[in-house]
């Protein structure tokens, strides 16, 4: 994770709770933090997309996730989003792939830049 304090950006190992600091996660940190949550919810597959996947995240970037699992329904997705936001201290945009139209721009973004951050078969 990166901590930003003024103009200096440093790698920080662990979590920082002081609200005056903002941070940008690297993908490996995101994977480590979300793994136990996805294990608990028994999610099959998750893609990271958007600014974090493109390595263009800023201090105010949210984290965009796409769940590829037909058994995760709306109420469970809402609860999952809350747990992820709490663990990451970031806004999360979470999508269920089955609810996105195939010809939509977001669908194309997910599959052109998406990075697997969780797969129940390999975690």
Sequence positions of predicted segments:
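Catalytic core of pol beta-like nucleotidyltransferases
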Residues: 2-45, 53-59, 70-123
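Short beta-strand->loop micro-motif that forms the acidic, two-metal-ion catalytic signature
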Residues: 64-67
């Amino acid at each position: 994770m990166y901590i930003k304090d003024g103009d200096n950006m440093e790698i920080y190992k662990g979590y920082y709770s002081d609200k005056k600091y903002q941070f940008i996660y690297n993908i490996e940190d995101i994977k480590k933090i979300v793994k136990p949550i996805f294990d608990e919810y028994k999610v099959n597959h998750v893609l990271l997309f958007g600014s974090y996947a493109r390595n263009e995240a800023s201090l105010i970037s949210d984290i965009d996730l796409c769940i590829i699992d037909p058994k995760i329904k709306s109420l469970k997705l809402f609860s999952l989003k809350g747990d992820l936001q709490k663990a990451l201290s970031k806004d999360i945009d979470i999508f269920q792939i089955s609810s996105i139209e195939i010809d939509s721009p977001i669908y194309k973004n997910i599959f052109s830049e998406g990075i697997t951050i969780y797969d129940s078969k390999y975690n």
